[in-house]
Amino acid sequence: MSMKPRRGTAAGKALILAALLTIAVPEAAHAKTADVTVVSPGPTMGPPTPFTGVSSHADCPDGLVSGGGADQAIGSDEMSNGNHVMGMVPSADGATEYVDTPGVVGTDAAHWMAFGGSGSRSSDAFSTTPYAICLSSNLIRHTQVVMNKAQGPSTGLSSKLVTATCPTGTVLIGGGARTTPASVGSLKPIASFPTFNDADHHFGAIAAGDGEHDPDAWTAVGGIGGGRGADNMTYAYAICSTDDIDLKHVSTTVRFTEVSGPNTASTGQTATAGCTRGEGRLVSGGAAISGGNVTTTDFGKATSGGPHLNGSFPSDAAGTPAGDGTANPSYWTAATHSGGSPSQGSYSDVWALCLDVRHGHKP
């Protein structure tokens, strides 16, 4: 039997390879991407006197702000009880705040502001360092900032909770909290966290829990010690995508950690949570000092009026703040402080919000 050469075999393989490349190249060209870079210009010193505040800002040279935070230096003597975070919020220009009518207050914010307050004590050691998380994505190209606000807390040892909710058809990627004025020394935000505008989460009063997917709102809680003030305000900010993206390509996952303390006077505590490789990029985070169980019950403040935040920032697994220019950090850390009085039953809470644009929506 004669053996004839199998003509066209090489050509056939070439055609098959060309066809596969035709399919693969467009798939690669249309792959969804998201990367973040930390921008932090260093500390702003102050406040230099009691009952005053200081502002600082970090600015994204490329991309948009998806979240941000602050870290404070407080010194080591008894004056350290005074410095506290007064706000961590998105900004249109790094100098002004969104504080007017609630609703969608801005688009494509690329700046982050961090505020510190001195309370009744001040020190030359006080400072506040801002952190902006700058997102670059070929899917989320535009963002919108939603603000909500409420008057209070206005009476001693009380709190005020307010929630900002993303518009339908958008994705929550971050948020922030703010209280004013700094002249009321014991007023401060004691919580800033992702949540859901649904009955299961009491429309923002219960925080998103570890492993929950796709929160759509951000809650801020203002707390006050012995001070009072009729003009006190608490602001919540949600940073959301626009509604022109295909939600099937996007999912977010919450990672949460709660640790006991600080319980004794003039002490601090930290808590850290992080995103795993399969959950996508860390795009924002939140922090609280609370009475505990914040993901199963309505948020409750710590028992005394002194507990406050000294930081909420991107970090490594050990809680060391991410440096300026860090690409794609995986962890978020909360730094809390008891103030000048014991506060038994206090807890430190931290949230990391992880964005996945490759594997899409998770049930």
Region locations from a protein language model:
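Secretory targeting and sorting signals
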Residues: 2-31
